[in-house]
């Protein structure tokens, strides 16, 4: 199984281009099932989860054509849904990726039936799917869960009013996709406001959907008879952006990220400024300068957008490990999201966990050691810590990393990091 080896000690300098957002491209690929003509998606990152989603679309009968593109521009994928002839998402694919559940709403809305295996993916807490089910039931779907499958039917979904019990990104996306072809008007309240949800809505609108309230907690959808073909460019990945900025801040470097979307990054950028970084932005670039400085520890609490994202928690924990002072991190979104702590301790970090809170005392010196990635963002935090550790840090189970970061070792190498992938 492949590993990544990081040799610490180098400050990062230079420029890096950000890939398309993992958490936007997966629902957008699923949304192509709603159309009755080919849909082109551009700025698609080379990620394992994208490969899995493309396989899933193929299993359902869609014809998928991929133009590999370049490292800086991403791929273009054309999905022709006219040949879809299956409505079952098999366990073999769904078990490896939770986002597979996002075919539930589109299949149900377009074809009147869907069977989706209960999802797998990251080992982070329970992540219940009840919000998906309740929301689609509010639009008239008949749904049963049996033998490990969600089985849904509907002649045609009907507009309705549904309030999510809790903020759910994929729940919002699934019910939104169901509503665009429903008969009449749907009002969804307590929706997730993440930029990736808004990007999905922009894609649906490009195909002919009628959606109002983008970026707010209330979405109003006027159902249409059909969605046509079209083209959509996936927005840049704000978590990848944040990861590279934290790497620059930790190592005392200066890095410019290109093809970014600074207006989706307020919570992360403000914490980096609090840590002592100087930050300059344009419409699509962010430059972070931490030259000659050690970061200051920061306190943070994860919460739904626009608050601090849970997907950046592990990276900021790595920053706090080498920062000046004590940082307190509260994780309010997912259970089991401190699985990286034991691995950071192996590098010499000083972390105490009490329930959903981690207290991190900064230590100027970490030491390289063999560590194991437990999930996607944890694997990124171990690379960041490795950049600051003396000697070599070897990170095992990096298949987690390939689910969400495109060519991370090449990109870090281009900034001066000593990092390589080994068999």
Curated annotation (Swiss-Prot):
Pathway: Cell wall biogenesis; peptidoglycan biosynthesis. Keywords: Cell cycle, Cell division, Cell shape, Cell wall biogenesis/degradation, Cytoplasm, Peptidoglycan synthesis, Pyruvate, Transferase. GO terms for biological process: cell division; cell wall organization; peptidoglycan biosynthetic process; regulation of cell shape; UDP-N-acetylgalactosamine biosynthetic process. Gene3D superfamilies: Enolpyruvate transferase domain. Phosphoenolpyruvate binds at residues 22-23. Transmembrane segments: none annotated. It comes from the Bacteria. One of its GO terms (molecular function) is UDP-N-acetylglucosamine 1-carboxyvinyltransferase activity. It catalyses: phosphoenolpyruvate + UDP-N-acetyl-alpha-D-glucosamine = UDP-N-acetyl-3-O-(1-carboxyvinyl)-alpha-D-glucosamine + phosphate. The keyword Transferase applies. The modification 2-(S-cysteinyl)pyruvic acid O-phosphothioketal is found at residue 122. It is found in: Cytoplasm. UDP-N-acetyl-alpha-D-glucosamine binds at residues 98, 127-131, 311, 333. The active site is at 122 (proton donor). One of its GO terms (cellular component) is cytoplasm. Coiled coil: none annotated. Its EC number is 2.5.1.7. The keyword Isomerase does not apply. HAMAP family: MurA. NCBIfam families: murA, PRK09369.1. Belongs to the EPSP synthase family. MurA subfamily. Cell wall formation. Adds enolpyruvyl to UDP-N-acetylglucosamine. This is UDP-N-acetylglucosamine 1-carboxyvinyltransferase. It comes from Stenotrophomonas maltophilia (strain R551-3). The lineage of its organism: Bacteria, Pseudomonadati, Pseudomonadota, Gammaproteobacteria, Lysobacterales. The gene is murA.
